[in-house]
Design a protein with these regions (language model features):
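Catalytic cores of the polymerase beta-like nucleotidyltransferase superfamily
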Residues: 1-459
Length: 459
């Protein structure tokens, strides 16, 4: 037992003291101990105790049965809730996810034995110090992710621990130790038994960590082959073009590192070039081109995010950003207005961040020029918005009702005419006048070309 001291929240200390005075053992446990020893601010303070759930409820006035069948009761101190879980031994696991039964125990060591990694298997009590039976402190000092006990047994109990190993490695910048790595490659196929929602959560935690480039490690260990096979397809795909010196995987990893740790933005950079293997072509001078790869990548993003059960808002934003990330436009007001019309004002600033990160992962020789141009585009964007310039159908001086009154029937033609009017105003803001727009609409309604959209160009 290490006689190190830790600062714990006052309310957590109240719970430890209350259980102790009632005759029970109680410790803060797991991630909060790990983070405190690393000098990080813990997000949650979990408590483990020798008291059974009904005994915990008898000690405290306000409790919630959050997972009582697994021994967990939430103790409310004011408006703050703390999960208090009885020492337990998990029974046999039948599906790499859930134990058949949970058996309570009076021994803290038995509870710590069932935890995933040594750095998460430490407990602390102000009176007793730190309980570190598996050298978690040593592994923190060595910067090692190591399973408690036999790694294969830990992964058999819950296969998601395979992804958690990479996640903690990415969050902390730690190495995974040899036997744990070997067990991962041996047991990785068991991830097929894990729900899409749980896979999604761990994937996002890796991506928004300090080291999103550890996706390379996930691929090396065979994890992506099971949960994200689309990633494996970009490994080793060359990009012989003046804009690139890295293969698609290396470019992708660098692009993720170049953007803020935001879920939508990191997911966008992860998948922005997933379509490149499908469209790669070698032209006469030996250059490799990837025509319309953003559209193909967007289709992959849609499929992947549905498979992993992402929420609709996140999925829609990511797919749109992936689709438009390669849009070609210049710094003129007309070009920026057209880009705003295509991309959407709601995600345009994220779109600029995506293009910035993409550029910074290209050939260093082209980066300064491309960043300078992007800065000009961003400057123009702010001017267009500040001046209230028109770039959407909603900003037109006329609406659908005006066109119906002018004799255009509701239906596809009406929508096509409105789109063409919007394009006309994007090209020339002086056209945003009711009389001029009605005059143009009269010409457009009989023009077969009204249904032909303006072509967009992609990098």
């Amino acid at each position: 037992m290490e006689r190190l001291s830790m600062r714990i929240p006052e309310n957590a200390a109240v719970i430890l003291k209350g259980l102790s005075e009632a005759g029970y053992e109680a410790y803060v446990v797991g991630g909060c101990v790990r983070d405190s020893l690393l000098g990080r601010e813990p997000k949650d303070w979990d408590i483990t105790t020798s008291a059974r759930p009904e005994q915990v409820k008898a000690v405290f006035a306000h409790t919630i049965d959050t997972g009582i069948e697994h021994g967990t009761v939430t103790v409310m101190i004011g408006k703050e809730g703390y999960e208090v879980t009885t020492y337990r031994i998990d029974g046999e696991y039948e599906d790499s996810r859930h134990p058949k039964e949970v058996q309570f125990t009076s021994q803290l060591l038995e509870d710590l034995k069932r935890r995933d990694f040594t750095i998460n298997a430490m407990a602390y009590n102000p009176d007793r110090g730190i309980v570190d039976a598996f050298d978690g402190i040593g592994d923190l000092e060595r910067k090692i992710i190591r399973c408690v006990g036999v790694p294969q047994e830990r992964f058999d109990e819950d296969a998601l621990r395979i992804m958690r190993a990479v996640r903690f490695s990415a969050q902390l910048g730690f190495e995974i130790d040899g036997p744990t790595k070997e067990a991962i490659t041996e047991k990785v196929q068991q991830l097929e038994n894990i729900s899409a929602e749980r896979i999604q959560m761990e994937l996002v935690k890796i991506l928004v960590s300090d080291h999103p480039e550890y996706m390379r490690l996930a691929c090396d260990l065979g994890i992506t082959a099971v949960v994200l096979p689309e990633y494996d397809r970009i490994r080793g795909v060359s990009q012989h073009t003046p804009n690139h010196i890295y293969d698609v995987e290396e470019h992708t990893l660098r692009a993720m590192m170049n953007i803020v740790p935001d879920k939508v933005l990191r997911l966008t950079m992860l998948m922005h070039d997933f379509g490149k293997p499908d469209v790669k072509k070698v032209v006469e001078d030996g250059r490799e081109i990837f025509y319309k790869h953003p559209e193909v990548s967007a289709a992959y993003a849609e499929k992947i995010m549905r498979r992993l059960k992402f929420d609709n808002d996140t999925r829609t934003k990511v797919v749109r950003l992936v689709k438009w990330h390669g849009l070609k436009y210049d710094a003129s007001e007309v070009s920026v207005r057209r880009a705003l019309n295509r991309v959407g004002q709601d995600i345009f600033e994220d779109f600029i961040k995506v293009q910035h990160a993409d550029i910074e992962a290209k050939n260093p020789a082209v980066i300064p020029g491309k960043l300078a141009l992007l800065a000009e585009k961003e400057k123009t964007y702010h001017k267009v918005i500040a001046e209230g310039q028109c770039f959407t159908v909603r900003q037109l001086a006329i609406g659908g009702l005006d066109l119906i009154r002018a004799g255009i029937e509701p239906g596809p033609l009406l929508g096509a005419v409105l789109d063409k009017l919007t394009e006309a105003v994007i090209d020339d803001q002086r056209m945003n006048n009711k009389e001029k727009l009605l005059e143009l609409a009269e010409k457009l309604k009989d023009d077969p070309a009204v249904f032909t959209p303006k072509e967009d160009f992609f990098m």
